[in-house]
């Protein structure tokens, strides 16, 4: 009995439930994609009701495949796409608008307006983040300002906000029938509203945004029992005991618990997190300061993060928008058929540029095209753009920390691509290491939940679960490395200053 932990991984493109055993191995999983809604250029939405329905389906699927019941599950952990904002009516359980996704850029006017008084970094010392469309705060304000009746309902105390962790937890624990309205410190640190030192909502910033305090969930640690699954659900009476935003969860799943350890997750975007321990480090090089994790009553661990908006989604774009490939894995075959990129560089600034530039005026660019270039070169350039962007973030981490990283742990869907991982090692000049369990995001959430209920006893036990699967050593000489980075940086400059009054 109680031999397993289940993690709900509510991601940007799909929702998964993964069951882990005590060794951290995957026992079974269920997965369902949800619709990507693009009402206008720059707008990205999800149907929150669809996400909740899918969550129930994937839990059932994972249990069924392993022939398990709720009696076999010690705890539930939740991990999620961060920043994606859901606002719902707590009396009906209905969202007042679609979830506005982290990639969405519709709130640029709000960012510009708020930046007039004190600049884009006016809140950064307190919350660790620049003013940007990326974070939840501007999305909540947009919903209150633009959805009929939303502000009135919010001020009457009927509307609540949560990222998708909070939305799933609220529904899982009963919804309108006593659902728990809680988030953890890692998700709260991505709203623009949480004070990094007090780990509480900042009343002054909420006031500036015009967001009622009553909308905000209670902030708790990443590893404690928040409540139990409602009696109407398959996992009824199972404790929900861990929540981590997806990138922090991946860091935790990689057992990067010590100061100076880092990981890079390759998914829809790329996210490099560098553990700074109990110290809050403010970046001078375009990185975010965020909460890494907090276990129960222990002190929080902080991190520097380099967030890259578009990596894996560039491959989706080649497939879905251009029809250049019919499945994502094809891109590796095409890329491997040419010896280099043919002089082509792709800067996938579909939503502007995130770290380390923070340039919302940038848009996607393909540069260096000649008659010689074919689709194989384009495929290679698409993969290489992920590695180039990661190198720029790693350079920023090294500059901020003063201690150059000697290796990079990697995870996420794209790390199955050997060609990309080799090029990543080449362009970084340090070894790249893939663990045996690459589902580190879900594993991190499972670990947080399991620790809270005593399924695992301490971090040492989790560290002993980690094992290396493959390592890529750099094979490119430094002169060629720097030549390619010089051309990449030149390409990046070509993507900037595109958006103005004529081009939105």
UniProtKB/Swiss-Prot annotation:
Binding sites annotated in the UniProt record for ATP: 12-14, 268, 312, 316, 413
Source lineage: Bacteria, Bacillati, Actinomycetota, Actinomycetes, Micrococcales
Any GO MF annotation of the entry: glycerol kinase activity
Signal peptide: none
One GO process term, biological-process aspect: glycerol metabolic process
Name recorded for this polypeptide: Glycerol kinase
Entry's Gene Ontology cellular component terms: cytosol
Residues the entry annotates as binding ADP: 12, 16, 268, 312, 413, 417
Keyword Kinase: yes
Similarity annotation: Belongs to the FGGY kinase family.
Residues the record lists as binding sn-glycerol 3-phosphate: 12, 82-83, 134, 246
The organism's place on the tree of life at top rank: Bacteria
Pfam families (alphabetical): FGGY_C, FGGY_N
Classification via InterPro entries: ATPase_NBD (IPR043129), Carb_kinase_FGGY (IPR000577), Carb_kinase_FGGY_CS (IPR018483), FGGY_C (IPR018485), FGGY_N (IPR018484), Glycerol_kin (IPR005999)
Pathway linked to the protein: Polyol metabolism; glycerol degradation via glycerol kinase pathway; sn-glycerol 3-phosphate from glycerol: step 1/1
Keywords carried by this UniProt record: ATP-binding, Glycerol metabolism, Kinase, Nucleotide-binding, Transferase
Catalysed reactions, as listed in the record: glycerol + ATP = sn-glycerol 3-phosphate + ADP + H(+)
Keyword NAD among UniProt keywords: no
Binding site for glycerol: 82-83, 134, 246-247
Function per UniProt: Key enzyme in the regulation of glycerol uptake and metabolism. Catalyzes the phosphorylation of glycerol to yield sn-glycerol 3-phosphate.
Entry's EC annotation: 2.7.1.30
Regulation: Inhibited by fructose 1,6-bisphosphate (FBP).
């Amino acid at each position: 009995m109680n031999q397993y932990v289940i993690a709900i991984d509510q991601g940007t493109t799909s929702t998964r439930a993964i069951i882990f055993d005590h060794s951290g191995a995957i026992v079974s999983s269920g997965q369902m994609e949800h619709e990507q809604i693009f009402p206008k250029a720059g707008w990205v939405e999800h149907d929150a009701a669809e996400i909740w329905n899918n969550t129930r389906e994937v839990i059932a699927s994972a249990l069924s495949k392993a022939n398990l019941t709720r009696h076999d599950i010690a705890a539930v952990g939740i991990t999620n796409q961060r920043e994606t904002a859901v606002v719902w009516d707590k009396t009906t359980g209905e969202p007042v608008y679609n979830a506005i996704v982290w990639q969405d850029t519709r709130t640029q006017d709000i960012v510009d307006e708020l930046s007039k008084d004190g600049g884009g970094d006016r809140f950064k010392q307190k919350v660790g983040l620049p003013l940007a469309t990326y974070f939840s705060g501007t999305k909540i304000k947009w919903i209150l300002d633009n959805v009929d009746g939303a502000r009135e309902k919010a001020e009457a105390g009927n509307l609540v906000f949560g990222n998708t962790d909070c939305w799933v937890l609220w529904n899982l624990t009963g919804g309108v029938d006593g659902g728990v309205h809680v988030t953890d410190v890692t998700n709260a640190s991505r709203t623009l509203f949480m004070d990094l030192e007090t780990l509480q909502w900042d009343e002054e910033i909420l006031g500036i945004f015009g967001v009622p305090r009553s909308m905000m969930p209670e902030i708790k640690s990443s590893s404690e029992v928040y409540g139990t699954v409602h009696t109407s659900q398959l996992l009824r009476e199972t404790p929900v005991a861990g929540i981590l935003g997806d990138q922090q969860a991946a860091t935790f799943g990689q057992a990067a618990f010590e100061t100076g350890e880092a990981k890079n997750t390759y998914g829809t975007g790329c996210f490099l997190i560098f553990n700074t321990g109990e110290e809050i480090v403010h970046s001078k090089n375009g990185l975010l300061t965020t909460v890494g994790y907090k276990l129960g009553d222990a002190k929080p661990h902080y991190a520097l993060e380099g967030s890259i908006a578009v990596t894996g989604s560039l491959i989706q774009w080649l497939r879905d928008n251009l029809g250049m490939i019919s499945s994502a894995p094809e891109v590796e075959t095409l890329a491997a058929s040419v010896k280099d990129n043919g002089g082509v560089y792709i800067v996938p600034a579909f939503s502007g540029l995130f770290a380390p530039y923070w340039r919302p005026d940038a848009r996607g660019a393909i540069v260096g095209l000649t008659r010689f270039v074919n689709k194989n070169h384009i495929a290679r350039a698409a993969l290489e753009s992920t590695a180039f962007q990661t190198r720029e973030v790693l350079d920023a981490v090294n500059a901020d920390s003063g201690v150059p990283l000697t290796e990079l742990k990697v995870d996420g869907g794209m790390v199955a691509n050997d060609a990309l991982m080799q090029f990543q090692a080449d362009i970084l000049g340090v070894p790249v290491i893939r663990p045996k369990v690459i589902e580190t995001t879900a594993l991190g959430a499972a670990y947080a939940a399991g620790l809270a209920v005593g399924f695992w006893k301490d971090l040492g036990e989790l560290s002993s679960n980690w094992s290396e699967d493959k390592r890529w050593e750099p094979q490119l000489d430094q002169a060629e490395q720097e030549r390619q980075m010089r051309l990449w940086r030149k390409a990046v400059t070509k993507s900037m200053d595109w958006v103005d009054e004529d081009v939105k």
